[in-house]
């Protein structure tokens, strides 16, 4: 069997001037996902691309979009939707880098930033808009036609991390976003994800309108997303009452004290609490979760990348897609409900052939989750042997005191009030939107009845 000869960017249809930009960014040949989809996108096909984090997915859609935009540089050419602010920022940065020599105008539309400024940016018709569904939906609901008119003529819709965007969480916001876009037959739609679900695969069989070529589905290793072979996976079984004390014990034993680590939790309140406890205990820690404003999140990631903080406490916002360097240790303070989320979390370590370690803190309520994870990864987690109950008990008092103080600080700061206000604002906006929709339906029904008479 002959070895596969990798195609060049030129073979895929990328112009010399854009190849020169790639070389300036030290990108010399396409990755598997880029090789698999770029030519098909340039041919005008709708596309689903599946590849793991760090495989070059963003350039796989950014390059053909810029290539086609250069031949027709008008209006809002492409809308890229992604589930988190951090992913949106990274995509926006890649478009900025790839389009730097072309006067490509791009706008970032995400929460945590000035909404009026974003409305103005959108009304200026940038060539590429990178957005989270919630903030774009807010702008659509609260602004007039002048602001959103450019979205009605886009040539490309990209949904990055499509498996998450197509979950019920984003359904209402996506409905509002899609309501101002061209019909599917009048644009190219590109879906990219690290996990190609059966529901996404079924989209391949939907008939294409306006004589469009069949949808192109290309997967790289996504049917077997797996943990790295160099990863050591273990667990400690503890009472739920002493999880925080065991966590501090884990972080401070000689084997782990100097390691860079990400601690994953399931809720923003837990992330804030654990971060505050570790900060009060004078560990070099930072945090990342959706309750932080954008400036705080960027600063926090910067501290972790620069190793000013050795520990990052995070929700699953940090498990996929973010430009975070490989760490030496991943700790699951909370086990995820979905075993695939476990794989994405522990995939933050043992990258590029390096060794790494993951430790899951398991309580009496987590046994079924552990079994599901073991079935998914195809191996048993080993028991972590470097902690002891006697040593953990030495931390109980100071951890309990720190937890009490951290809880009081969160109450004093009104932690969670920002989300509550945002939800109230969104409910109000949805109420107005629904009234307008219902009004439109009644008017349409009335007109229909009038016609029938």
UniProtKB/Swiss-Prot annotation:
Catalytic activity: ATP + H2O = ADP + phosphate + H(+)
Residue span(s) of domain Helicase C-terminal: 230-393
One GO term (biological process): rRNA processing
This protein's record includes keyword Hydrolase: yes
Region annotation (Disordered) ranges: 413-453
Domain Helicase ATP-binding as annotated: residue spans: 38-214
Enzyme class: hydrolase
Signal peptide: none
Motif Q motif, chain ranges: 7-35
Compartments where found: Nucleus, Nucleolus
EC id: 3.6.4.13
Keywords: ATP-binding, Helicase, Hydrolase, Nucleotide-binding, Nucleus, Ribosome biogenesis, RNA-binding, rRNA processing
Placement of sequence motif DEAD box: 160-163
Binding site for ATP: 51-58
PANTHER family named in the record: ATP-DEPENDENT RNA HELICASE, ATP-DEPENDENT RNA HELICASE RHLE-RELATED
Function of the molecule: ATP-binding RNA helicase involved in 40S ribosomal subunit biogenesis and is required for the normal formation of 18S rRNAs through pre-rRNA processing at A0, A1 and A2 sites. Required for vegetative growth.
Protein name: ATP-dependent RNA helicase dbp8
Native source organism of the sequence: Schizosaccharomyces pombe (strain 972 / ATCC 24843)
Gene that specifies this protein: dbp8
């Amino acid at each position: 069997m002959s070895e596969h000869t990798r195609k060049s960017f030129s073979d895929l249809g990328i112009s010399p001037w854009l190849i020169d930009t790639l070389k300036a960014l030290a990108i010399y040949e396409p990755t598997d996902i880029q090789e698999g989809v770029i030519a098909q996108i340039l041919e005008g096909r709708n596309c689903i691309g599946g590849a793991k984090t760090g495989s070059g997915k963003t350039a796989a859609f950014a390059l053909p979009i810029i290539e086609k935009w250069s031949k027709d540089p008008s209006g809002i050419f492409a809308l890229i939707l992604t589930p988190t602010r951090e992913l949106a920022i990274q995509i926006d940065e890649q478009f900025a880098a790839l389009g730097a020599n072309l006067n490509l105008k791009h706008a970032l539309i995400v929460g945590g930033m000035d909404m009026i400024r974003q409305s103005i940016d959108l009304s200026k018709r940038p060539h590429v808009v990178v957005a989270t569904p919630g903030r774009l939906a807010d702008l659509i609901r609260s602004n007039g036609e002048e602001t959103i008119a450019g979205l009605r003529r886009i040539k490309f819709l990209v949904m990055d991390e499509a498996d998450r965007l197509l979950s019920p969480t984003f359904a209402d916001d996506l409905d509002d976003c899609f309501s101002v876009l061209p019909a599917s037959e009048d644009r190219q739609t590109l879906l990219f994800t690290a996990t190609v679900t059966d529901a996404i695969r079924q989209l391949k069989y939907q008939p294409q309108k306006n004589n469009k070529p069949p949808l192109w589905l290309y997967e790289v290793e996504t049917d077997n997303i797996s943990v790295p072979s160099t990863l050591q996976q273990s667990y400690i079984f503890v009472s739920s009452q002493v999880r925080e004390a065991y966590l501090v014990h884990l972080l401070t034993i000689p084997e782990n004290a100097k390691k860079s680590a990400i601690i994953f939790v399931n809720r923003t309140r837990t992330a804030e609490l654990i971060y505050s406890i570790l900060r009060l205990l004078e560990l070099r820690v930072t945090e990342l979760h959706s309750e932080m404003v954008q400036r705080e999140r960027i600063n926090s990631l910067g501290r972790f990348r620069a190793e000013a903080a050795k520990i990052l406490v995070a929700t699953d916002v940090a498990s996929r897609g973010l430009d975070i360097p490989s760490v030496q240790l991943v700790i699951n303070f909370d086990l995820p409900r979905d075993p695939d989320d476990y794989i994405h979390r522990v995939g933050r370590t043992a990258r590029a052939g390096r060794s790494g370690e993951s430790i899951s803190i398991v309580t009496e309520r987590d046994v079924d989750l552990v079994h599901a994870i073991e079935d998914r990864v195809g191996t048993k987690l080993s028991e972590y042997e470097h902690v002891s109950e006697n040593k953990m008990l030495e931390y109980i008092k100071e951890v309990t005191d720190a937890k009490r103080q951290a809880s009081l600080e969160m109450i004093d700061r009104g932690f969670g009030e920002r989300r509550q206000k945002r939800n109230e604002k969104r409910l109000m906006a949805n109420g107005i939107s629904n009234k307008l929709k219902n009004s439109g339906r009644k008017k349409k029904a009335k007109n229909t009845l009038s016609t029938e008479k």
